[in-house]
């Protein structure tokens, strides 16, 4: 089975941006989210990962714009950012996206998250945003600025709730082009039977090949952001490298 690549479109104030380590204020602008998403579709993407960073940081939202973008795309969309209650979840799903990615809600409101998983099943993925603190993997919430508790305890709880897939980000790697945390991915795969989507740190085609080497352990896909925008490689090159 080949690795699914999900090019990322992160949106701030109506513009496609990339952050460094998820820090507000570290944005580099890349123009229209619509143009970015359509470009990835034209380059052969089967999925696009779209993040409303304003909603993630709790400073507004780009919901109407993103609904328009999802509506224009023919490919599947994973929608993320600020989905923390019934209203934001239903609005996200109403865009017609393939699935949504819950982050902070899984940490701060486990009962609600469990209900969402029970109701929507495969439409719900949970983002596990991780940072190594004193030798232990800890989760981060609210745009990665709040403490979220122990990774393994949360993963066990979400597995029990029936979570269908996890998007695993090493926050220290994201937007840095320093390579993915393969050890973290392997450990998460060993701890759950649910498929895992990797995120953060991809800088070269070889990084993607290394992640593809974990497909037989449970890694299903990889989100790719800054490396594509920075021109390290093209999406067609990446897709060719990890197909089959």
From Swiss-Prot:
Gene3D superfamilies: Aldolase class I. The keyword Amino-acid biosynthesis applies. It catalyses: 1-(5-phospho-beta-D-ribosyl)-5-[(5-phospho-beta-D-ribosylamino)methylideneamino]imidazole-4-carboxamide = 5-[(5-phospho-1-deoxy-D-ribulos-1-ylimino)methylamino]-1-(5-phospho-beta-D-ribosyl)imidazole-4-carboxamide. GO terms for cellular component: cytoplasm. It comes from the Bacteria. Its EC number is 5.3.1.16. Pathway: Amino-acid biosynthesis; L-histidine biosynthesis; L-histidine from 5-phospho-alpha-D-ribose 1-diphosphate: step 4/9. One of its GO terms (biological process) is L-tryptophan biosynthetic process. Keywords: Amino-acid biosynthesis, Cytoplasm, Histidine biosynthesis, Isomerase. This is 1-(5-phosphoribosyl)-5-[(5-phosphoribosylamino)methylideneamino] imidazole-4-carboxamide isomerase. It comes from Rhodococcus opacus (strain B4).
């Amino acid at each position: 089975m080949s690795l699914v690549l999900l090019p990322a479109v992160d949106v701030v104030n109506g513009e496609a941006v990339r952050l460094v380590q998820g820090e507000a204020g570290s944005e580099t602008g890349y123009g229209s989210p619509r143009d970015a998403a359509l470009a990835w579709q034209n380059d052969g993407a089967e999925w696009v990962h779209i993040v409303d960073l304003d909603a993630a940081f709790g400073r507004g939202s780009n919901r109407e714009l993103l609904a328009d973008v999802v509506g224009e795309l023919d490919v599947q969309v994973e929608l993320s950012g600020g989905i923390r209650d019934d209203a934001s979840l239903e609005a996200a799903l109403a865009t017609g996206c393939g699935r949504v990615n819950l982050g902070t809600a899984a940490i701060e409101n486990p009962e609600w998250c469990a209900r969402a998983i029970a109701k929507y099943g495969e439409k719900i993925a949970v983002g596990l945003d991780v940072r190594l603190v004193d030798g232990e993997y800890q989760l981060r919430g609210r745009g990665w600025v709040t403490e979220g508790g122990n990774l393994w305890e949360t993963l066990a709880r979400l597995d029990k709730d029936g979570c269908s897939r996890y998007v695993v980000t090493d926050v220290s790697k994201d937007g840095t082009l320093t390579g993915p945390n393969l050890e973290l991915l392997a450990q998460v795969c060993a701890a759950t039977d649910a498929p895992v989507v990797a995120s953060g740190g991809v800088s070269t085609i070889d990084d993607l090949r290394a992640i593809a080497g974990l497909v037989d352990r449970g890694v299903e896909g990889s989100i790719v952001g800054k490396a594509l925008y920075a021109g390290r490689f093209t999406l067609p090159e990446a897709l060719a490298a990890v197909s089959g």
